């Protein structure tokens, strides 16, 4: 009896130790551990990730008070480089990222979905060897209805001095990314990232003001029941995509989930498996999502988790953009589900 009690005590202690170790693993500590196998000149990435986390905290705080503050909800009346009406939260979140990095000495350039051209920080150049590419608010149409939103980020190393200010070195494939991830603003605020060594998630503990490790080395299931797509665009798609939707409608075991915020939908698929689709249309075959700010960062992360991301014909990470704001179709998620969508598209071609 004493031995059984002793064994139980050891088991409880081990469980407690693991929980305590996890609770003590902050984002900054975890990133430093990841960087142990990187070269010495990559250590700035720890400070860079901390700045991204700070931007996420500031945006999360603003969103949590959105219904109580003036000038947070609604549109600005302006149109961005994408031709889309700009939400007030789009502007605020974009300004937050600029402000957080402006005096950091870490990045020379910021490239955002919301800005026509990269934002240069001369005082950080050439010391700041990195470029941050980001979508400050993904799913901004959800802002006024208190639904989930996100931010997407990607880190690349600057190549050359960019003396002509054209940022041509960014027009390379997604395999040049050093790190990528997203921040999900939902019932809790989560930060999920990869540095090419697995995918790791952190939850913001409001009492500590720290992102604490939630799960390490996340693996996406090979197959999932969820398909996530805006079926309101059904009649605008190519016939091959419509055939895929008909297939999931008549096949038992599939369920549709679509929130209007890609980060939210991708996070569900990362955890539960399935596929997210944002295909091109007959009139706009290039699709809607921006390659550098949305598709490539999420493709890097999902592939690190064991999933896949494609245009339907080409791996997203192999697409070389011709311009900063280039769009691309996106099919991303569990490898078996992505392959199923590909089979319809490729047979249609």
Swiss-Prot record:
Pathway: Carbohydrate biosynthesis; Calvin cycle. Keywords: Calvin cycle, Carbohydrate metabolism, Cytoplasm, Hydrolase, Magnesium, Metal-binding. Gene3D superfamilies: 3.40.190.80, Fructose-1,6-Bisphosphatase, subunit A, domain 1. The keyword Ribosomal protein does not apply. Substrate binds at residues 138-141, 230, 258, 288. Mg(2+) 2 binds at residues 135, 138, 294. Transmembrane segments: none annotated. One of its GO terms (biological process) is fructose 1,6-bisphosphate metabolic process. InterPro entries: FBPase_C_dom, FBPase_class-1, FBPase_N, FBPtase, Fructose_bisphosphatase_AS. It catalyses: beta-D-fructose 1,6-bisphosphate + H2O = beta-D-fructose 6-phosphate + phosphate. The keyword Metal-binding applies. Binds 2 magnesium ions per subunit. It is an enzyme of class 3 (hydrolase). GO terms for cellular component: cytosol. Mg(2+) 1 binds at residues 113, 135, 137. It comes from the Bacteria. Its main location: cytoplasm. Belongs to the FBPase class 1 family. This is Fructose-1,6-bisphosphatase class 1. It comes from Trichormus variabilis (strain ATCC 29413 / PCC 7937).
């Amino acid at each position: 009896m004493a031995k059984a009690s002793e064994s139980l005590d050891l088991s409880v202690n081990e469980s407690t130790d693991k929980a305590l170790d996890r609770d003590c693993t902050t984002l900054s500590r975890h990133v430093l551990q990841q960087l142990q196998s990187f070269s010495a000149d990559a250590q700035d990435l720890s400070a860079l990730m901390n700045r991204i986390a700070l931007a996420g905290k500031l945006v999360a705080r603003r969103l949590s008070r959105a219904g109580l503050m003036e000038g947070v909800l609604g549109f600005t009346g302006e149109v961005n480089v994408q031709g889309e009406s700009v939400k007030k939260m789009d502007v605020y979140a974009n300004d937050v990222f600029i402000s957080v990095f402006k005096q950091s000495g870490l990045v020379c350039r910021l490239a955002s979905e919301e800005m026509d051209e990269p934002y240069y920080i001369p005082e950080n150049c050439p010391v700041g060897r990195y470029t941050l590419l980001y979508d400050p608010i993904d799913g901004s149409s959800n802002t006024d209805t208190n639904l989930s939103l996100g931010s997407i980020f990607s880190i690349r190393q600057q190549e050359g001095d960019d003396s002509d200010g054209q940022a041509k070195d960014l027009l390379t494939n997604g395999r040049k990314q050093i790190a990528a991830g997203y921040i999900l603003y939902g019932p809790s605020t989560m930060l999920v990232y990869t540095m090419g060594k697995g995918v790791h998630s952190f939850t913001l503990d409001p009492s500590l003001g720290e992102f604490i490790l939630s799960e390490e080395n996340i693996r996406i299931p090979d197959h999932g029941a969820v398909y996530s797509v805006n079926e309101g665009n059904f009649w605008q798609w190519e016939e091959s995509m419509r055939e895929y939707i008909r297939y999931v409608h008549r096949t038992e075991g599939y369920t549709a989930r679509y929130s209007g915020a890609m980060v939210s939908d991708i996070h569900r698929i990362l955890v539960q498996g399935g596929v997210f689709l944002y295909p091109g249309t007959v009139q706009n075959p290039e699709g809607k999502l921006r390659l550098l700010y949305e598709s490539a960062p999420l493709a890097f992360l999902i592939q690190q988790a064991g999933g896949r991301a494609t245009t339907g014909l080409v791996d997203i990470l192999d697409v070389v953009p011709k311009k900063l704001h280039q769009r691309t179709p996106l099919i991303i998620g569990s490898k078996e589900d992505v392959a199923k969508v590909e089979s319809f598209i490729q047979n249609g071609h």
